[in-house]
A protein has these predicted regions:
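Active-site hotspot residues in diverse enzymes, especially metal/ion-binding acidic/histidine motifs
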Residues: 27, 31-39, 45, 154, ...
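Conserved active-site and cofactor/substrate-binding residues in soluble primary-metabolism enzymes
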Residues: 4, 24-28, 64, 81, ...
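Acidic/His-rich, divalent-metal-binding segments that scaffold phosphate/diphosphate chemistry
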Residues: 1-61
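Divalent-cation-assisted or electrostatically stabilized phosphate/pyrophosphate-binding catalytic cores
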Residues: 75, 130-171
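Short polybasic/polar patches that bind polyanions
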Residues: 14, 34, 38, 74, ...
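Divalent metal-dependent catalytic cores for phosphoryl transfer on phosphate-bearing substrates
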Residues: 39-144
Length: 182
């Protein structure tokens, strides 16, 4: 199966993910990833689909995530860049130790958990993502009692491998996520 178009990827996501939050999280990550692809001169479609499908097996297989999806992606002949990115985004989760070795993988690792911070912040302050202030988001990153399940270390590891600092990354996500409805 070739890499699906956006509508096909969305249908695939919906066939495996029923939870509204997980679907919205996937959309947030996909949108941010497409923004990064354009910003860095890469393929926005590949990056969008990678972001959209990165947690496709989480709801069905939380204790082994992303093992199942990695198998599916290989069986479907998805690009190796996507497969590596999904594996690396699980760094330090379920005993995964693969670090990102591509810009796609680094961006996914940096973006995934940060989207959780953005989502939680928006629940507390219902403003559009594009109107959020980087200073406020960074303050919430430092507050480990806020969105306590978010693994902040992976955000920093992703930024390091992407070659950007946290300030730039937060500002990029404010810009990239600005198009999403709140």
């Amino acid at each position: 199966m070739p890499l699906p178009a956006k509508a096909g990827a969305q249908a695939l996501l919906e066939s495996h993910v029923q939870d509204d939050y997980q679907r919205y999280h996937a959309l947030m990550v996909a949108t941010a990833m497409a923004g990064y692809a354009e910003h860095l001169g890469h393929d926005p479609h590949l990056w969008y689909v990678t972001g959209l499908l990165h947690d496709i097996d989480f709801e069905e297989h939380p204790d082994s995530h992303p093992t199942e999806s990695l198998g599916w992606f290989k069986a479907w002949n998805y690009p190796e860049d996507l497969i590596h990115a999904v594996e690396a985004h699980a760094y330090s989760y379920n005993d995964f130790t693969t670090l990102p070795s591509t810009p796609l993988a680094a961006a996914l690792l940096a973006t995934d958990e940060l989207c959780g911070i953005f989502y939680a912040y928006q629940k507390m302050n219902p403003i559009p993502f594009g109107e959020m202030k980087a200073k406020s988001i960074k303050k919430k990153i430092k507050d480990h009692s806020f969105a306590a399940k978010v693994d902040r270390a992976t955000i920093f590891t992703g930024c390091e491998h992407l070659g950007i600092d946290l300030d730039e990354h937060v500002n990029n996500l404010i810009r990239f996520l600005g198009e999403l409805p709140h």
